Regions:
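Short beta-strand segments
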Residues: 119-120, 183, 213-215, 249-251
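Short pre-catalytic strand/loop immediately N-terminal to key active-site residues, enriched for Gly-Thr
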Residues: 142-153, 413-416, 457-458
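Metal-dependent amide/peptide-bond hydrolase catalytic core
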Residues: 31-42, 218-239, 243-474, 478
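Acidic/histidine-rich catalytic neighborhood of metal-dependent amide-processing enzymes
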Residues: 145-146, 152-235
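Acidic/His- and Gly-rich active-site-bordering loop/insert found
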Residues: 35-149, 170-177, 355
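Loop/turn elements at helix/coil->beta-strand transitions in domains of secreted/extracellular proteins
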Residues: 87, 114, 177, 208-210, ...
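Sec-exported extracytoplasmic/periplasmic mature domains
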Residues: 56-59, 83, 87, 166, ...
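Low-acidity, Ser/Thr- and Arg-rich intrinsically disordered low-complexity segments
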Residues: 8-14, 18-23, 29
């Protein structure tokens, strides 16, 4: 622990110093027709310890209220960090004891503009310590990384938010528009006791907000250039598939395990689940996916024919990120849980399966028709969770501000839109008409399999990337 930072970290610090010098000369900047105060110095080094501290709060979300500790302890700590520098903080619990959320607003220079929501979730998925190189809730700082559950999903962004919010308030920095910092519960279970509850029960918290940024966007993907060398693409999330969790139920004739018959619920269910799990739904490239592949093709010279049945194979050229991209080319139905029986020698009357379905925008009816054909008449289905898809366009002043912020710190950057195969709290906020993007900037090592870290063993985030992201985000929030 506490090892010296590798060379890339020193480069980030040099970039930070040069930025500080520029900002120190100009304490004010004109954004549009409004003069706003800009930062003289962003304390980017602070983010490492803040993220480490956040990870040490065990905010595991099992998906069951009975076994989920909740986010309250962590949320109270976040609230204290903001109150300490003068924010009027609202702490509230969302639908169940211990499900803590924190909101704080920073007034901007132009009150006539819509506010910007910067949101992050405090909960994390479970982790088994025996499987990890370090304890998942240690927040260890080793080998140039901060380790632990939540390091990339998403206490990295939460840490950046805290550092920047404190710095802006302490330094008297006035952004161009109102900023609303939201730290919420239960994202890892669809937001039932978090963002969804807040939107349904406390819409006043989002009054005046027109746009939002959150997780799983703004990270770099290094690709080979067609003329030699490499290019860093920064993926801005502009779309998400819908999230539908489905329960399948087969009913059969119960009986003694020694006597075989043709109405075994377990057999019926297993056959249906196997058909569904092996099925590949049709390719339906969306606007965000087409724009992403077009941009990658321009840089690399790779050909991506979105009308080709072998588009999956072409996407494999992208390396580890191909897992996410391939999952956005079509609908998916992934069996994740099975339940049947209570004794070895008893044939059960029912058998159940749970399937995680992620569906492209506008595809729900067609998806349901395909599923019904696959599972057959002897298996019933029901949705246990249904959260919508969304897609926005890759344009406008906010996108321009993201691009400018990245270029200010990484002149070789290029921003590109992409679709997330998973889901975020943006699904809830979009219901209020808020235009949502994924923008949690990280400059990553080219050989880091970033997507494998989400919900993975030995989840970790580079120290350099945290400092880079804090600098980019601070620039963005003074020009948004």
């Amino acid at each position: 622990m506490g090892m010296p930072a590798p060379k890339p970290a020193r480069r980030v610090r040099r970039l930070a110093k040069s930025t500080r010098k520029r900002c120190a000369v100009a304490r004010a900047s004109v954004v549009g027709k409004v003069t706003v105060t800009v930062p003289a110095e962003t304390p980017i080094d602070d983010v490492v310890d803040v993220v480490s501290r956040l990870i040490r709060f065990d905010t595991t979300n099992t998906g069951e209220l009975e076994t989920t500790k909740g986010e309250a302890e962590c949320a109270h700590w976040v609230a204290a960090q903001l109150a300490d520098v003068g924010y009027q903080v609202e702490y509230l619990e969302s639908g169940a004891p211990g499900r803590g959320n924190v909101f704080a607003r920073l007034k901007g220079a132009d009150s006539s503009r819509g506010a910007l929501l910067i949101h992050g979730h405090l909960d994390v998925v479970p982790a088994e310590p025996a499987e990890w190189s370090v304890h998942p809730f240690s927040g260890a700082i080793e080998d140039g990384y901060v380790w632990g559950r939540g390091a990339v999903d998403m206490k990295d962004m939460v840490g950046m938010m805290i550092v920047i919010a404190r710095h802006f308030r302490r330094s008297g920095i006035v952004p161009p528009r109102d900023l609303v910092f939201a730290f919420v519960a239960d994202e890892e279970n669809g937001g039932k006791y978090g963002s969804q509850w807040l939107v349904d029960n406390r819409p006043d918290l989002f009054e005046g907000i027109t746009e939002a940024i959150g997780e799983v966007g703004g990270f770099s993907l290094t690709v080979p250039r067609r003329d030699g060398g490499e290019r860093r693409l920064y993926l801005i999330e502009t779309a998400e598939k819908s999230m539908h969790w489905m329960r399948l139920t087969a009913r059969g004739r119960p009986g003694h395990g020694s006597m075989v018959h043709d109405h075994n619920a377990v057999t019926t269910l297993a056959e249906a689940v196997a058909r569904l799990g092996r099925h590949r739904f049709p390719l339906v490239p969306t606007d965000s996916v087409v724009q992403f592949l077009t941009a990658v093709g321009e840089e690399t010279g790779f050909t991506f024919d979105t009308d080709s049945p072998d588009l999956d194979g072409a996407v494999e050229k992208l390396g580890p990120i191909a897992r996410i991209v391939k999952a956005t080319l079509r609908d998916t139905a992934n069996p994740t849980m099975l339940k049947a029986g209570y004794k070895t020698n008893v044939v059960p009357a029912t058998a159940e399966a749970v399937v995680d379905c992620r569906i492209l925008p506008g595809r729900l009816a067609a998806f349901e028709a395909e599923v019904d054909e696959l599972i057959g008449p002897d298996v019933t289905r029901e949705w246990t969770t249904s959260l919508p898809s969304y897609e926005t366009t890759f344009d406008g002043d906010l996108v321009d501000a993201m691009n400018a912020a990245l270029l200010a710190v990484d002149p070789d950057a290029r921003t590109v839109p992409y679709m997330l195969s998973g889901g975020t709290d943006a699904k809830a906020f979009e219901r209020l008409g808020i235009r949502c993007f994924g923008f949690a900037p990280l400059r990553l090592p080219p050989d880091l399999d970033f997507t494998a870290l989400f919900h993975g063993i030995d989840e970790r985030v580079p120290v350099d990337a945290l400092k880079f992201g804090t600098e980019v985000l601070a620039h963005f929030l003074t020009h948004c």
